[in-house]
Amino acid sequence: MDKKVARIRRATRARHLMREQGATRLVVHRTPRHIYAQVIAPNGSEVLAAASTVEKVIKEQVKYTGNKDAAAVVGKLVAERALAKGIQAVAFDRSGFKYHGRVQVLADAAREAGLQF
């Protein structure tokens, strides 16, 4: 089993538990150059809010899109968009990534912006 398969297995297990609980999820995906965050409905079929470093709005605010500063901007923006749609509480789905570095910074920024998890 390689590193990617192990991460996907961890993510699948966590998503199964969140789906059983019927929780709205804040899903994070990271690549070496970008980070993506989506708020997904409990049934898993609808994206309610999203933000990523691919967006022009965020690219204008940060110097480089693959660092912690960019992750903080994405976390704040996705939280603001979720709160604007009336979503206040979510379950944090880290997609099998370690809760460390950019993933942790994104989560902290979303919490500071008012999202509860």
Curated annotation (Swiss-Prot):
Query: Is the keyword Protein biosynthesis assigned to this protein?
Result: no
Give the protein family: Belongs to the universal ribosomal protein uL18 family.
Which HAMAP family does the record cross-reference, listed alphabetically?
A: Ribosomal_uL18_B
Q: Which regions form coiled coils? A: none
Q: Which organism is it from?
A: Actinobacillus pleuropneumoniae serotype 5b (strain L20)
Q: What is this protein called?
A: Large ribosomal subunit protein uL18
> A Gene Ontology MF term for this entry?
structural constituent of ribosome
- Subunit structure, as described in the record: Part of the 50S ribosomal subunit; part of the 5S rRNA/L5/L18/L25 subcomplex. Contacts the 5S and 23S rRNAs.
